[in-house]
Amino acid sequence: MLTRIQKIFDAMEQQSVAYVFSGDAISKTADQHFPFQVNKNFFYLTHLNLHQSVLVLIKHKKEDVMLFVPVRTKEKEKWEGILPNFEQIQQETQLSDIRDKATFEAFQTSLFTTLRDATYGELKHVYLDVARPERSCLEEVTFSHELKTNYPELHIHALSHVFKTLRTIKTDDEIQTIKEAINITHQGLNRLVKTLQDNKEEHRLHASFLYELHKNQAKEAFDTIIASGKHATILHYVDNNDHIEQNALVLCDLGAQKNQYNADITRTYPSSGVFTERQKQLYQLVLEVNQEMIEWIKPGKSFKDFKEVGKQLLAEKALKIGLIKTPEDISQYYYHGLGHHLGLDVHDPCDYDMVLQEGMVLTVEPGIYIEEEGIGIRIEDDILVTNTGSINLSEAIPKTIDAIESLFK
């Protein structure tokens, strides 16, 4: 954690302070909240899944780090549970200066008044982790507005570009955690296929996948898509409540989240256990693009080219089978990007102008969607960029026609 914090310091000007907020649970009703989702940049620096917290970095004559965390009263613990104490947080984060969040406002006032000269000297620059300012309900956005109003002389900078650079390259520990999430996803798909053999309801397949996640103390990485027949032509179909027709294809786009890191896998299954000839033709087309683009990935290649080359491959193969008449027609049947970075976020932040580098984790997810035939096919894998090429982290999850049909035997 300290190495990551040091990289934030390295990106900061002298006489500056940076704030990274953990976020808070959003109210659902008078006495309920939606599940808390920690700010992944805060987690990246602290490894804490803790609400209402603030990491503060001050760069002046020396570099100071302090972490403000909530402290619950005994009465509140009876309702909401026990939070980690300062000693436990110190052990987890390797940070020594842990403070009660209740003191943050007074601390903040002291930074930008005459008292600052005695402690830190004049501070001229403020760095904020505010990537989406339109979400004005978030504490950090409100905080940003107050700073601009009360201290207009300050130079305010965004940290988002720094986190993009840092989080794009995964450490060995991060890669291992992503592998764990993929393995749980694989187990969930195995159970889902067994369920599909006897139950032709989308919601039953979803339930079987959720069971495996809960069994492994994992969460859904995103809203699971179980889309059969014509629903598979809708990219973000999440109703998962229709009957699955005989000889339909079932597109399953899903993933487990383990210790905040995500898997993102898509497999497409024949509801009867056997592909029809037309389904085989289209499925093989998508599979070949998936496989060829995984082979295409190497350090030094452009992420923009990755998307464009994949689209061109789809068009070439669609032309050969007569699905389209011109390469431009592919947009009628393929209308999303070929992939994205994966990590703490399912769509991990990145600089799209960066070339591929060792340690990046990408998805490769070509698809074909033919509304008039009620067919949607997508095949998605999670790929690690190595020093010489790539490794398919989800290779163990069956995806060839023979391998998928064997699952039903």
Positions of predicted regions on the chain:
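Active-site neighborhoods and metal-handling regions in enzymes and metal-associated proteins
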Residues: M1-K409
